[in-house]
């Protein structure tokens, strides 16, 4: 099984992914931001127009990792900003893929961003991505409004939906 946790910066993707991974006896967490950070010379920011080519390489790597872990019986949890079309593509590749979009309010996102070890530097990305996610129809990603959720509640909601989907 592959579980994709998507959302804007500060939506809780990493925290939710790590906590969710602990609910499975054999799981792996793939933070795509960490793969992006491996590129030192020639690193292109995700909001740069030229990022698409670099993302293809990053995607190629996290999909290879996904395949390898699946072959060894792991549940794979991927944390990235991923749209419905990508989830559909991954479903065709791996079959058993579930996508979740964490979509707290924009005010909550900005508050969380300031609480992180940052200066609110991702506010601009939040301003761009939030309307895209909030105003799109999602037929593959299941939307979770985690505005007033504790981490454990968001994880339980996802876990419950996964259990219901696998029957």
Regions found by a protein language model. Give the residues of each.
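P-loop (Walker A) phosphate-binding loop of NTP-binding proteins
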Residues: 8
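ATP-binding Walker
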Residues: 11
């Amino acid at each position: 099984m592959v579980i994709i946790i998507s959302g804007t910066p500060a939506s809780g993707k990493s925290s939710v992914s790590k906590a969710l991974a602990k609910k499975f006896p054999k799981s792996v967490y793939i933070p795509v931001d960490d793969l992006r950070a491996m590129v030192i010379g020639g690193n292109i920011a995700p909001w740069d127009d030229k990022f698409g080519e670099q993302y293809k390489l990053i995607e190629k790597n996290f999909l290879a990792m996904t395949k390898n872990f699946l072959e060894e019986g792991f549940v794979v949890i991927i944390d990235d900003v991923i749209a419905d079309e990508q989830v559909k593509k991954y479903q065709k590749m791996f079959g058993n893929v579930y996508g979740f979009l964490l979509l707290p309010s924009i005010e909550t996102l900005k508050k969380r961003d300031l609480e992180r070890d940052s200066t609110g530097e991702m506010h601009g990305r939040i301003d761009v991505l939030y309307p895209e996610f909030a105003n799109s129809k999602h037929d593959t990603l299941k939307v979770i409004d985690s505005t007033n959720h504790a981490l454990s509640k968001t994880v339980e909601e996802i876990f419950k939906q996964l259990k219901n989907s696998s029957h």
